[in-house]
């Protein structure tokens, strides 16, 4: 099987490639990247079939899926800049689907998010929903994964959460009761591999780790991962938005945005969890040391 992976040098892409290399020769894995020099240092091996492409530029995708059996689309951005949700999460996905159809690809595996819907009131989830619609409307059999928050060495979410530890008192959006079901990136990679192999898992699947945890528990585990302790304080989300707005204006890569604050106060758990029920994968635990890699970094 020849597999193309968009965002190959990203968090999910790197971990997926490392897993697939046990089954597929490196030359059969087509790694799509935007910056080849940077990707060379991030990818597991230089023996991959590396192609330079930008999902927002259809002409750069021309021919990159030729000869591929499947495409795994991992590219997305959680932070919007100047209409980037529409350009990347929506337009980029449509471009990938169009080129995959032209190339005769036989399967698309798409990485989405819990709560994705074209009618969502939240801009990020709305963009992911519109991207999903492009995938499911395609003439290619597809598997769509909607994971809860991901963790593992190199993740982006928990270091951003850890930014709050710079403050003497850590603010908690709302009452901190919003629930999440963190999923290890290695377990997501296992599910993607199964989706590439099996014909009985087509469709949309919500996935997460074994146990739901509250936002307060996420913070506690993040503190344990960094070996730090801080008192916390509940704050209404509207009171936290001015600080997030300031971060967006003065930082190139803000730890949190106004739009993301809203999502931190909303449940993010799978209903049902397809990891065990559909894919037969028992995801690894998050609690009690799941974030120990944070202090190593």
Model-derived segments and their meaning:
Residues 6, 32, 74-75, 108-114, ...:
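SDR active-site strand-loop-helix element
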Residues 11-14, 90, 129:
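Residues forming the Rossmann-fold NAD(P)(H) cofactor-binding site
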Residues 37, 46-95, 99-102, 114-117:
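NAD(P)H-binding glycine-rich loop region in Rossmannoid oxidoreductase-like domains
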Residues 114-126, 150-155:
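Conserved catalytic-site region of short-chain dehydrogenase/reductase
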Residues 156-157, 174-196, 203:
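Substrate-positioning beta->alpha
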Residues 195-257, 270-297:
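Mid/C-terminal beta-alpha module of Rossmann-like enzyme folds, strongest
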């Amino acid at each position: 099987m020849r597999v193309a992976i968009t965002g190959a040098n990203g968090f999910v892409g790197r971990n997926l490639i490392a897993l697939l290399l046990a089954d597929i020769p490196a030359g059969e894995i087509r790694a799509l990247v935007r910056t080849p020099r940077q990707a060379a240092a991030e990818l597991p091996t230089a023996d991959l079939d590396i192609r330079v492409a930008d999902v927002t530029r259809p002409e750069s995708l021309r021919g990159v899926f030729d000869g591929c059996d499947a495409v795994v689309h991992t590219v997305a951005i959680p932070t919007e800049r100047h209409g980037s949700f529409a350009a990347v999460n929506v337009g980029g996905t449509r471009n990938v689907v169009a080129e995959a159809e032209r190339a005769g690809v036989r399967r698309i595996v798409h990485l989405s998010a819990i709560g994705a819907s074209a009618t969502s009131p939240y801009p990020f989830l709305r963009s992911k929903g519109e991207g999903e619609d492009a995938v499911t409307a395609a003439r290619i059999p597809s598997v769509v994964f909607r994971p809860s928050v991901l963790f593992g060495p190199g993740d982006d979410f928990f270091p951003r959460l850890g930014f709050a530890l710079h403050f003497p008192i850590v603010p908690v959006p709302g009452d901190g009761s919003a629930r999440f079901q963190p999923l290890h990136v290695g377990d997501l990679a296992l599910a993607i591999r199964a989706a590439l192999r099996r014909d009985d898992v087509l469709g949309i699947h919500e996935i997460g780790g074994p146990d739901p945890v509250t936002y307060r528990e996420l913070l506690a585990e993040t503190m344990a991962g960094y070996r730090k302790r801080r008192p916390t304080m509940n704050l209404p989300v509207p009171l936290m938005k001015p600080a997030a707005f300031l971060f967006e204006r003065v930082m190139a890569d803000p730890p949190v945005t106004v739009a993301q604050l809203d999502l931190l106060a909303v449940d993010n758990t799978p209903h049902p969890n397809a990891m065990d029920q559909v894919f037969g994968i028992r995801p690894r635990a998050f609690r009690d040391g799941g974030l120990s890699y944070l202090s190593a970094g």
